[in-house]
């Protein structure tokens, strides 16, 4: 009997000691896991240091329509997010700024020498004009078209300023050395005579421009042309795809 009790007590002591050791072991492991910082997964792809960082938004700058392809002079500045579609011609020294849309799907659109179409402008043309005047949109030389303006089948003669947020409707005509104030609406067939300042909705005659004011009009266009040169210098004429070609040739062991 005494021997049996001794064996039972020995087993119970052994099991108790073993369970205490197990608890201590797992507790120590849990503390070690909790205090050990989980290693961050290593990046699987390491970008090449010479790789061009593309900013692709899926927007096309030049959109041919049928047989019509937009034409841009070599020294004209057209911002990357501008859309030129169809019968559009951008002449030398001119500039078309960010977000503008020139839609020549129905008729011709021309931006003349040293003229500028500023941010978010929309320029388009109708099949025909109810006034009997040409339905194409013509922006002649040394013309400044302010931001957020809308031009449709209108004619702007040389050395004019169109204020921002203005609307020029079908058949409207702005004669040379004239100014249309910001936020104005020029109704269909309305004509602004040479050397006058107009404004309002609908646009009305305000006063005659002084000789000094008319001389400042082309200077503004030239100043914007010089500003566009700073932007133009940041873009290569044929993009940066040549870097990818050189890298591909190098990977194939082809002499560059």
Curated annotation (Swiss-Prot):
Keywords: Membrane, Metal-binding, Mitochondrion, Transit peptide, Zinc
Localization, UniProt: Mitochondrion membrane
MF-aspect GO terms: metal ion binding
UniProt cross-references to InterPro entries, sorted A to Z: LbH_gamma_CA-like, Transf_Hexapept/Carb_Anhydrase, Trimer_LpxA-like_sf
GO biological process: photorespiration; response to abscisic acid; response to salt stress; vegetative to reproductive phase transition of meristem
GO CC terms: cytosol; mitochondrial membrane; mitochondrion; plant-type vacuole; respiratory chain complex I
The organism's place on the tree of life at top rank: Eukaryota
Signal sequence extent: none
Topology of this chain in the membrane: Peripheral membrane protein
Primary localization: mitochondrion
Transit peptide segment: 1-33
SUPFAM superfamilies assigned to the protein according to its UniProt record, in alphabetical order: Trimeric LpxA-like enzymes
Record-listed substrate binding positions: 103-105, 118-119, 152, 164, 231
Residues reported to bind Zn(2+): 124
Family: Belongs to the gamma-class carbonic anhydrase family.
PANTHER family to which the protein is assigned, alphabetical: DYNACTIN SUBUNIT P25, GAMMA CARBONIC ANHYDRASE-LIKE 1, MITOCHONDRIAL-RELATED
Task performed by this protein: Involved in complex I assembly in mitochondria and respiration.
Quaternary structure and partners: Component of the mitochondrial oxidoreductase respiratory chain complex I; element of the extra matrix-exposed domain, which is attached to the membrane arm of this complex. Interacts with GAMMACA2.
Protein name according to UniProt: Gamma carbonic anhydrase-like 2, mitochondrial
Naturally occurring in which organism (per UniProt): Arabidopsis thaliana (Mouse-ear cress)
Lineage, broadest ranks: Eukaryota, Viridiplantae, Streptophyta, Embryophyta, Tracheophyta
């Amino acid at each position: 009997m005494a021997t049996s009790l001794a064996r039972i007590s020995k087993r119970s002591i052994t099991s108790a000691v073993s369970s205490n050791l197990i608890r201590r072991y797992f507790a120590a492991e849990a503390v070690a896991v909790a205090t050990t910082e989980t290693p961050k997964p290593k990046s699987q792809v390491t970008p090449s240091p010479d790789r061009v960082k593309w900013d692709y938004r899926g927007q096309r700058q030049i959109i041919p329509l049928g047989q019509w392809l937009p034409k841009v002079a070599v020294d004209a500045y057209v911002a990357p997010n501008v859309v030129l579609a169809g019968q559009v011609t951008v002449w030398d020294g001119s500039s078309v700024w960010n977000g503008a849309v020139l839609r020549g799907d129905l008729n011709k659109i021309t931006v003349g020498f040293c003229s500028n179409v500023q941010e978010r402008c929309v320029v388009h043309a109708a099949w025909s004009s109810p006034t009997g005047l040409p339905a194409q949109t013509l922006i002649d030389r040394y013309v400044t078209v302010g931001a957020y303006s809308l031009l449709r089948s209108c004619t702007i003669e040389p050395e004019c300023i169109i204020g921002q947020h203005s609307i020029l409707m079908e058949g409207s005509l702005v004669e040379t050395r004239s100014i249309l104030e910001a936020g104005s609406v020029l109704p269909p067939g309305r004509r602004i005579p040479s050397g006058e300042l107009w404004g309002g909705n609908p646009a009305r005659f305000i006063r005659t421009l002084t000789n000094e004011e008319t001389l400042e009009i082309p200077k503004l266009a030239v100043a914007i042309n010089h500003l566009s040169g700073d932007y133009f210098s940041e873009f290569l004429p044929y993009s940066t795809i040549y870097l990818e070609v050189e890298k591909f040739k190098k990977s194939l062991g082809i002499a560059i």
